């Protein structure tokens, strides 16, 4: 019983139960002096004509440090002493609605509002219409201590009550206005409650702000409507309100205004219509409940502790730091906008057509899929009864198959706020000129075309910041407008957890979820792959071999590199790696691990974090988070809809009729189908309210603008809440040749033919190039020519000052090892640092031991943003809203200015970045399958895919044939865009992980010497290492110091101290060479000692009589037996 009580308590002790009762939201009223408008505007999404915009919920900026992110919001009075509450977290934006003009626009180009309205009408979406009742008078909200013109006002609302705010159904209680401290400033806030809480509704002060409603309508609801494939966002708002307020999660809500493509309705394809409708309904029911579920607050919200501000001293420093951070985020928005398969462009449910002459059997669970295709936007749609929903966009309104500004507005959900933020990010983007567009010239365009009054947006008044100018500069990078035709991955964006497995072999030998008997102890502890990588890195660090080589440093530290040292360095690394690989394989053999089988299923794993407060503080990032979750939920819903419809055919039914019969069953089944089935992990919270009576106020008195405290009982509207934790994205590392097309197999197949340039594609080329001048100081030819000539002609140059024997030995080493590397290498990567070289050799050894020698493994590569300043000649936005008279005028004004841009790099390790909680943008395809051995359960796997589109990033363009001649070899590499939060917004939690103490490094080096060396000189080597590391500091070492360095070998401390005493008596220069020569001269020769084999003799410890004969009394029997033992 006690255990059962503890379990119940554990389940009930959760974020939901801990949430206090409170209002549905707040109006915050800040003094004008609270904000540094230039700085804070960089966090917002204000455009030039904005009536409202939003800022993230940040402690010290928009909310107080003690702000509680979850609340049991009171929304209805059941009787005189009982209130009903709904649990919800807060929407992660504060919407500014008063004195908006005091903030600066994130993008200064005019006409965004009119462009969005035009695009909204063109693509058939229902525009925002304000309610008939008037707007709330903000003068009534303003505290009496301030004037209205000196106050900034914002609304902070819970996720569940956003729709009530949008529809003007919330009441503000001015009698309960109170102050809070935000960054040492007194700020007032007024609580908001639902109108259903009050009985006398005529005298209530309703909060209706058309600018706020319009902001939510486009930024949030139209974006959700696009993901759900409906055009009527106004009806969607009503549906979401019904779902939350009246708990209609199990009811179909969209099908009454759901529309379908003309071709689907025309063909009477009710199956496709029903599956489309069910996916949208389940997506709405579950996704919205996840967004409302309680979340933990995060360190991202602590604005004034962001790491980017750590070294800032002035306001301009902070502005620069924030601009650079925005530039780092920008690469993710670029990837989304320029990808053909972006989540912005997913807009259909389609059926997969069978591939003719294909060897691969079709998977019925993947037969329906979410399809991207910008051309679908122009297609006519109908309601289920055949009545027109959208008549289609005329072809004359667009530009054939070319991307237009209207498509960009569509990606922004016709929200001028989101569009302004998009344009701000696009200003950091470097253009890529197409070979099909030779007329491109931004200088000519700004000075002669953009400044003409023909421009419909700016009339030529501000050509430098006009969106038309920005679009002209980047037009070649946008994707073509094409029809979707196949099942492709879609690109999602969000934050990951810190526990990702992106090393070469991912989750190999992690031993998680595979231990059948957790309590069984093993003779040898399990040595995981993660531990192996850590050990290898530490040993390389101890040897000074962790950084990429540069020309000024040697391999083992400072000093010049030479041929002998180069060979010795890599020989040492090879020995170290081979020893660790052998130890790892032997450990698995001892533990009876079937590693040859387990390696076939290894994957890279990326954990996508579903906490809204972990998302990057940007309205576009939050929008992408919502769309990513909603799209993945719908994708997972497709197979259950397919299976259920096949058992309950929809033929003869309209979707509305069919859903009335079956939706509740589908909703119930779906809950058990998708949680912890391969993609989504979640937790079910049993929510309770511990207080028997809670503090509240008299509702009737509040109607008369009076505050009267009372005690109430609390009743929860929903006691069970399902919350998302992670989305697991996997990448299969090893190719499985079965059931794959020949085209796919050829991309991974390792051929027996040796490449002509095997050295230039080998393991040493980066190092040979970095050290070229030091290895061959008097040679006047380049590294590239030297080694390509050697590969082709096998000729060695004559180098003055270097013997032919030394040269021959060096070239033989490089030649033989490069050939050997090519034969055994299963990772299509050229190492660029000592760590990468060592890990590549290590993983090749493991793959070889596991029998994987036929196909290349898939490798993960991170595309990492790098901020750089470039000449502003082709970045006209640096001139702001100033006018331009001519080309010469533009050039004169801009030629001496610099523009902040973002470049991309492949030089950062994905495995290292994955530990720093990065923002990630990656393509994902959700595959569905049944269990093995007759298990009929459906499972899913979110697999990493490929980006589509040539303008996404320069690093995604195919390699030339200089190094590779095998077709489709690009498929061996998969890419993610990664921007770490740690080091930007978050301070590193454990600084010692990255920067070890010097004494730790010395200790590791000494212990590795003691472990790996068994010759007579081992103690001398330890002393020499101490002298090398500590220099003259060795003169002051005590016995305790030496014992620390020796660790478990501390019993030899006195021997080391004796040798140090010898050196102290001589008083030399305390260098490694000096100590080595002194100790060597004082060491006796060991050649005279002869060893013979030792034959172990089997000796019995005792000759006990186990006959059981009693030799004493019963009580003395054991004592008597012990007396016989000779211990």
From Swiss-Prot:
Cited InterPro entries: DBP_sf (IPR035989), Viral_ssDBP_head (IPR043031), Viral_ssDNA-bd (IPR000635)
Subunit structure, as described in the record: Homooligomers. Forms double-helical filaments necessary for the formation of replication compartments within the host nucleus. Interacts with the origin-binding protein. Interacts with the helicase primase complex; this interaction stimulates primer synthesis activity of the helicase-primase complex. Interacts with the DNA polymerase. Interacts with the alkaline exonuclease; this interaction increases its nuclease processivity.
Keyword DNA-binding: yes
GO CC aspect terms: host cell nucleus
Classification lineage: Viruses, Duplodnaviria, Heunggongvirae, Peploviricota, Herviviricetes
Region Required for nuclear localization, residue ranges: 1098-1127
Record bears the keyword Methyltransferase: no
Family named by the database record: Belongs to the herpesviridae major DNA-binding protein family.
Gene Ontology biological process: DNA replication
Keywords for the protein's UniProt record, in alphabetical order: DNA replication, DNA-binding, Host nucleus
Predominant location category: host cell
HAMAP family for this protein: HSV_DNBI
Protein name, per record: Major DNA-binding protein
MF term (GO), any: single-stranded DNA binding
Originating species: Alcelaphine herpesvirus 1 (strain C500) (AlHV-1)
Subcellular localization: Host nucleus
């Amino acid at each position: 019983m006690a255990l059962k009580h503890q379990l119940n308590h554990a389940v009930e002790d959760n974020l939901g139960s801990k949430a206090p009762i409170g209002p549905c939201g707040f109006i915050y009223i800040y003094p004008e002096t609270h904000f540094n408008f230039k700085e804070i505007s960089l966090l917002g999404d204000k455009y030039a004509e904005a009536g409202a915009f939003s800022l993230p919920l940040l402690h010290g900026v928009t909310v107080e440090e003690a702000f509680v992110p979850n609340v049991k919001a009171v929304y209805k009075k059941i009787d005189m002493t009982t209130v009903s509450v709904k649990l919800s977290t807060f929407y992660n934006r504060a919407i500014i609605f008063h004195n908006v003009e005091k903030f600066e626009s994130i993008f200064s180009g005019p006409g965004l509002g009119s462009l969005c309205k035009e695009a909204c009408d063109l693509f058939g979406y229902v525009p925002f219409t304000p309610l008939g009742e008037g707007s709330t008078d903000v003068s009534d909200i303003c505290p009496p201590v301030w004037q209205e013109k000196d106050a900034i006002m914002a609304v902070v609302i819970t996720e569940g009550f956003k729709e009530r705010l949008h529809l003007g159904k919330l009441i503000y209680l001015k009698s309960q206005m109170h102050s809070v401290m935000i960054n040492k400033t007194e700020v007032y806030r007024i609580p908001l409650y639902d109108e259903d809480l009050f009985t006398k509704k005529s005298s209530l002060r309703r909060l209706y702000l058309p600018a706020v409603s319009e902001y939510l309508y486009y930024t949030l609801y139209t974006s959700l409507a696009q993901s759900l494939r409906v055009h009527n966002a106004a009806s969607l708002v009503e549906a979401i309100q019904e779902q939350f307020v009246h708990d209609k999660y199990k009811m179909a809500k969209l099908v009454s205004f759901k529309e379908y493509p003309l071709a689907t309705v025309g063909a009477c394809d009710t199956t496709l219509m029903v599956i489309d409708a069910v996916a949208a309904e389940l997506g709405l029911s579950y996704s919205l409940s996840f967004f409302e579920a309680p979340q933990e607050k995060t360190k991202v919200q602590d604005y004034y502790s962001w790491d980017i501000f750590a070294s800032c001293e002035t306001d301009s420093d902070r502005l620069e730091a924030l601009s650079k951070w925005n530039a780092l985020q920008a690469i993710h928005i670029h990837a989304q906008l320029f990808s053909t398969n972006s989540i912005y462009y997913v807009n259909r449910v389609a059926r997969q057509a069978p591939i003719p002459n294909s060897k691969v059997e079709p998977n019925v669970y993947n037969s329906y899929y979410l399809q991207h295709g910008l051309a679908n936007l122009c297609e006519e749609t109908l309601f289920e009864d055949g009545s027109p929903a959208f008549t289609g966009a005329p072809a004359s309104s667009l530009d054939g198959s070319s991307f237009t500004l209207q498509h960009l507005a569509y990606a922004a959900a016709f929200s001028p706020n989101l569009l302004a933020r998009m344009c701000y990010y696009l200003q950091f983007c470097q253009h890529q000129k197409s070979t099909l567009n030779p007329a491109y010239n931004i200088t000519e365009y700004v000075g002669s075309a953009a400044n003409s009054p023909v421009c419909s947006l700016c009339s030529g008044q501000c050509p430098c910041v006009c969106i038309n100018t920005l679009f002209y500069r980047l037009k070649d990078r946008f994707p073509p407008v094409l029809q979707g035709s196949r099942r492709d991955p879609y690109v999602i964006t969000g934050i990951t957890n810190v526990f990702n497995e992106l090393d070469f072999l991912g989750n190999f030998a992690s031993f998680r979820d595979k231990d059948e008997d957790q309590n069984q102890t093993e003779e040898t502890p399990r040595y995981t792959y993660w531990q192996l990588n850590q050990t290898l890195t530490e040993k390389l660090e101890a040897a000074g071999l962790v950084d990429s080589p540069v020309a000024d440093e040697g391999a083992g530290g400072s000093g010049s590199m030479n041929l002998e040292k180069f060979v010795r360095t890599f020989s040492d690394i090879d020995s170290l790696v081979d020893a660790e690989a052998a130890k790892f394989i032997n450990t698995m053999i001892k533990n009876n691990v079937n590693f040859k089988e387990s390696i076939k299923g290894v994957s890279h794993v990326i954990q996508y974090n579903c906490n809204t407060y972990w998302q990057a503080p940007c309205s576009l990032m939050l929008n992408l988070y919502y769309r990513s979750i909603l799209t993945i939920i719908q994708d997972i819903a497709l197979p259950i809809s397919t299976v259920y419809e096949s058992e309950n055919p929809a033929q003869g039914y309209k979707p509305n009729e069919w859903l009335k019969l079956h939706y509740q069953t589908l909703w119930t089944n779906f809950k058990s189908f998708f949680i912890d089935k391969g993609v989504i992990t979640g937790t079910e919270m049993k929510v309770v309210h511990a207080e028997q009576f809670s503090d509240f106020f008299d509702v009737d008195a509040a109607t008369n603008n009076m505050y009267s405290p009372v005690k109430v009982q609390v009743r929860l509207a929903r006691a069970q809440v399902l919350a998302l934790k992670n989305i697991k994205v996997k990448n299969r590392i090893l190719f499985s040749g079965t059931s794959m097309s020949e085209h796919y197999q050829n991309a991974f197949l390792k051929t027996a033919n040796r490449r002509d340039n095997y050295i230039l594609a080998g393991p040493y080329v980066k190092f040979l190039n970095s050290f070229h001048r030091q290895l061959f100081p008097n040679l006047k030819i380049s590294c590239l020519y030297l080694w390509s000539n050697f590969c082709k002609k096998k000729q060695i140059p004559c180098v003055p000052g270097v013997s032919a024997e030394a040269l021959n030995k060096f070239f033989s080493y490089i030649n033989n090892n490069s050939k050997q590397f090519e034969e055994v290498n299963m990772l299509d990567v050229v190492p660029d640092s000592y760590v990468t070289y060592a890990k590549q050799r290590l993983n090749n050894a493991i793959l070889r031991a596991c029998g994987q020698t036929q196909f290349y493994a898939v490798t993960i590569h991170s595309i990492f943003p790098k901020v750089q300043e470039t000449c502003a000649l082709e970045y006209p936005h640096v001139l702001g809203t100033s006018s331009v008279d001519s080309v010469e005028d533009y050039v004169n004004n801009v030629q001496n200015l610099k523009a902040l841009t973002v470049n991309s790099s492949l030089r950062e390790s994905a495995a290292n970045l994955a530990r720093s909680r990065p923002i990630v943008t990656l393509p994902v395809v959700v595959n569905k399958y049944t269990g093995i051995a007759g298990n009929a359960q459906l499972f899913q796997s979110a697999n990493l895919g490929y980006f589509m589109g040539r303008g996404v990033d320069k690093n995604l363009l195919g390699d030339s044939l200089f190094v590779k001649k095998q077709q489709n070899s690009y498929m061996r590499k998969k890419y993610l865009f990664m921007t770490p939060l740690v080091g930007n917004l978050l301070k590193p939690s454990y600084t010692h992980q990255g920067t070890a103490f010097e004494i730790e490094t010395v200790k590791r080096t000494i212990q590795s010497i003691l472990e790996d060396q068994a010759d007579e000189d081992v103690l001398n080597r330890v002393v020499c290492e101490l002298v090398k590391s500590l220099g003259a500091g060795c003169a002051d070492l005590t016995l305790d110091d030496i014992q620390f360095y020796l660790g478990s070998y501390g019993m030899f401390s006195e021997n080391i101290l004796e040798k140090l005493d010898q050196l102290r008596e001589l008083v030399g220069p305390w260098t490694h060479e000096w100590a080595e020569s002194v100790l060597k001269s004082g060491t006796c020769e060991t050649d005279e000692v002869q060893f013979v084999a030792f034959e172990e003799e089997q000796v019995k410890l005792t000759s006990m009589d186990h006959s059981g004969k009693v030799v004493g009394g019963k009580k003395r029997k054991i004592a008597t037996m012990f007396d016989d033992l000779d211990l």
